[in-house]
Amino acid sequence: MTLHVGAEFAPREDDPEDEPRALELDLSVQYGDEITSDVRKTLPKRKLIAEWIEPALFASAQLTVRFVGENEGRTLNAGYRHKDYPTNVLTFAYDAAPDGTVIGDLVLCCPVVEKEAHDQGKPLAAHYAHLLVHGALHAQGYDHETSDEDAAEMEALEVDILAKLGFPNPYQ
């Protein structure tokens, strides 16, 4: 789910006259109060998070990834989506910087992600990679809840990016 905070959707087509530029990722990683040292040991580290997010970027980005527990996840989901349960990932997309840099926060609820990975028989790393790619796409304006066409476009991007990272299709 994406929460747009004054954000406009990112353009989806490249202008052939634009000069290619190196994309930059300014990444911060945070841990909520409920995340114990034992849980932190199971989470992807900053370098790996960046490796998973970078292929999903179509513009430079300033992103914060925050790992939270069930209470914070529920509070955020209730406060912003009016749903009284924790969800796997929330994306807060903000207005882009003047130079076009995407700015956003990705909040992952560890207990939900762990339960989903277990229930779906997926490696935990594969599920975190999928949700980070999913959240990064949301931060750039992609939204699977607006139409079937948008959902198909976003899903295809996720599958392609994850395949390049060596992960199987998360929807199969």
Swiss-Prot record:
Known cofactor(s): Zn(2+)
Cofactor note: Binds 1 zinc ion.
GO cellular component, one term: cytoplasm
Protein EC: 3.1.-.-
GO MF annotation list: metalloendopeptidase activity; RNA endonuclease activity; zinc ion binding
Protein keywords: Cytoplasm, Endonuclease, Hydrolase, Metal-binding, Nuclease, Ribosome biogenesis, rRNA processing, Zinc
Binding-site positions, Zn(2+): H134, H138, H144
Gene3D superfamilies named among the record's database cross-references: Metalloproteases ('zincins'), catalytic domain (3.40.390.30)
Main location: cytoplasm
Keyword Zinc: yes
Localization in the cell: Cytoplasm
Xref: InterPro entries: MetalPrtase_cat_dom_sf_prd, YbeY, YbeY_CS
Listed GO biological process terms: rRNA processing
Disulfide bonds, paired cysteine numbers: none
NCBIfam families documented for this protein: PRK13963.1, rRNA maturation RNase YbeY
Family from the record: Belongs to the endoribonuclease YbeY family.
Function as written in the Swiss-Prot or TrEMBL entry: Single strand-specific metallo-endoribonuclease involved in late-stage 70S ribosome quality control and in maturation of the 3' terminus of the 16S rRNA.
PANTHER family: ENDORIBONUCLEASE YBEY, CHLOROPLASTIC
Protein name: Endoribonuclease YbeY
Organism: Burkholderia cenocepacia (strain HI2424)
